[in-house]
Amino acid sequence: MRAPAIGALFFVIFVPLIIIMGDYWDHRPQKETAVLVGVITQNQTEEMAREYLEELAFLVDTAGAEQRAIFTQRLDVPHPKTFIGSGKLIEVREYVKEEEIDMVIFDDELTPSQLRNIERELNCRILDRTNLILDIFAGRAQTAHAKTQVELAQYQYLLPRLTRMWTHLERQRGGIGLRGPGETEIETDRRIIRDRIAKLKLQMTKIDKQMMVQRKNRGKMVRVALVGYTNAGKSTLMNLLSKSKVFAEDKLFATLDTTVRKVVVENLPFLLSDTVGFIRKLPTHLVESFKSTLDEVREADVLIHVVDISHPNYEEQIGVVETTLRELGGADIPCMLVFNKTDAYSYIKKDDDDLTPSTKENLSLDDHIEDWNRSHPGSLFISALKKSNIDELKDQLYQKVKEIHVKRYPYNDLLY
């Protein structure tokens, strides 16, 4: 082919492509921008506030937004009218206006009156932690069951907040905090919302009964449930033990629908459930709405509490899970404590001549293993991703399941 022909071909094929791609990059969807707000109080130390806001930032990322700034204020208690003081509110308002921020997210559940007052002052979309979690759940729900549960929780949250300054246009445009229960306008009659809640509760009653029948129909096989803080690696472990493909991702609430698989270890079968992860300040509406999902935990014979050992605040996360289990009525269920993500663990090693007191940041993985096996004998340390120490986990799990079979069922009634 002659050179002029090649040049002509370039202009015919590549120039239009370059123009198209340039137009795409100029008009590609932009992430919504968010400012985070938290308070330091008598009941929430500066360190706790920082940890909670880090988690809120992870939630924001999971929801698909971009965090631009964090504002904190030290108060005895949150301001009853605006959550934060007037001076801090002005500071946030100026930043929002100057940077053209889409939304401000508070790391606590705001009262309806606080929400209205803050919206009036900041003149932008206001979300709280509960609203954000509900929005993530709405985006994650796949089955009709999960969608019904989330929609019910959203409407229960929305009912006392119908006077929020959301316009019909905003709901049509969509965005974080605006997903879910349809094109509800500000002027929507409360009665319509209550009627919808009543219908959803009726649907959930039917779903709960169906789920209960399904659990009964599983026969006498032992039930094992994976529990833990969100993003601890439960789904990755589920995939490893069941040799199935359960959606696993480095995001909060990657699993929403409960997944149940039949697993066989050394010819002994049992049912393994992967459940929704727990989190600090889990909205009450979600706990109520996800009754049938959480029944998988309540009715389990054995719990595997999966902990992310690489998280700097894993001990507090353990406390959140244990508190939630108590509230669900599952505190007395035999539980295996499994520390996951050993491959991601890191620490700051002190020099031999460093005489300063050691902190938890200086503890090696071996130090943690020694401490936990002293206080909780039988604790396991694994990496589901790297498949390390999985055989020991299977051995312990086999012994637990076998013990329940032998104790509760005749030998000839075992399922093989």
Range-by-range predicted roles:
Residues 13-129, 133:
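N-terminal accessory targeting/assembly segments
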Residues 1-10:
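Positively charged N-terminal leader segments that act as targeting/secretion signals
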Residues 20-36, 156, 160-232, 238-239, ...:
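C-terminal-of-GTPase-core extension/linker across diverse P-loop GTPases
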Residues 43-47, 79-82, 140-141, 185, ...:
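Flexible beta-alpha connector loops of hexameric P-loop NTPases
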Residues 40-44, 75-77, 109-112, 131-134, ...:
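Conserved nucleotide-binding/hydrolysis micro-motifs of P-loop NTPases
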Residues 219, 242-268, 284-289:
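Switch I (effector-binding) loop of TRAFAC-class P-loop GTPase G-domains
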Residues 287-311:
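Inter-motif core of Ras-like GTPase G domains
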Residues 28-29, 96-98, 262-266, 271, ...:
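Conserved catalytic network of the ASCE P-loop NTPase/AAA+ motor domain
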